[in-house]
Amino acid sequence: MKLFLVLIILLFEVLTDGARLKKCFNNITGYCRKKCKVGERYEIGCLSGKLCCVNDEEEKKHVSFKKPHQHSGEKLSVQQDYIILPTITIFAV
């Protein structure tokens, strides 16, 4: 009976890294692992002391999606009546 109770407790035990891999921080499309897989590269360290492994193909898709459209040397010919100055608020300091 004791063995049965121990078996039930072990079945409901959830491992910390078993269910899902933790994602890396700072908007990096990678996962924290002990070793990187083939086709992945090491980006930065995770908080848990593991490596942040980034898949090269997924990173290219992510960077091209987030990259804003740049104008090819075109200058705007619109004249403004005022000058836009940078402002600093109390909350920004």
UniProtKB/Swiss-Prot annotation:
User: Where is this gene product found?
Assistant: Secreted
> What InterPro entries does its record include?
Beta-defensin, Beta_defensin_dom
Please explain the role this protein plays, according to its UniProt record. Has antibacterial activity.
* Signal peptide interval: 1-18
Question: Which terms under GO biological process does the entry name?
Answer: defense response to bacterium; innate immune response
**What organism is recorded for this protein?**
Hylobates lar
Q: Which UniProt keywords apply?
A: Antibiotic, Antimicrobial, Defensin, Disulfide bond, Secreted, Signal
Say if the entry is tagged with keyword RNA-binding. Answer: no
Q: Does the keyword Transcription apply?
A: no
Q: Which Pfam families match?
A: Defensin_beta_2 (PF13841)
One GO CC term, this protein: extracellular region
Tell me which family the UniProt entry assigns to this protein: Belongs to the beta-defensin family.
Cystine links in this protein are: 24-52, 32-46, 36-53
Q: What is this protein called?
A: Beta-defensin 128
